[in-house]
Amino acid sequence: MHVEAIDRLDSFEAFEALLAEPGPWIGGFDFPFGLPRSAVAELGWPLDWVALVGHCASLSRTEFRARLDAHRQARAFGDRYAHRTVDRPAGSHSPLKLVNPPVALMFLEGAPRLARAGVRVPGVCAGDDSRIAIEAYPGYLVRSITRASYKSDTRSKQTPERAEARARVLAALTRADHCLEVALTAPPDILAQAQSDASGDTLDAIVCALQAGWAARAPGFGLPDGVDPLEGWIAGVAQVNV
């Protein structure tokens, strides 16, 4: 897979404009597209994805937080967060988490925008076949290369060790030495950006694109049989791990 350029979006409006761009394109987006079916049922929310994201979008952030907080507190200690089927094998956080990281809020902002844009989300909802959105998760692929931390938003934690980890990840990507076995090519300046960006955002964007590229070439976008359309699936996570 070849990366030609990296654009940076600084607003939700810019993200909406990206989703509205005419196809054909496929994009990998690093936020949860769905919620755990068990939690949705317990909350009494719609069990259809389009209806679910519409319902969540109708709530204020305060209301959304309050519903998830109440649901979490009602669960047994040690099992506060429900997970989607894909979360355990992917090593991803429950999309109900509101902090560290606030992936529930990422769902709240991201998923309704996908629905409103009318893009196709394979395994989740029909839409414009020329504009395809895939749920990506850089952490899954990167952990097949190294378990070392490679990024931080805190300046004091942007260490030489993390820079070295980014270098190892980039080297492995160019060799296709990772779980998806797709080789990355990119101009030297883009590789340098990914190496120097201590937040990891540039490297994560590249990995998301690689996951989307892998899905574009895989039969059925690489989805296992029986994906729950309420929960969705993360690109590249193997069915055998479920």
Per-segment meaning from a language model:
Residues 1-242:
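RNase H-like (RuvC/DEDD) metal-dependent nuclease/polynucleotide-processing core
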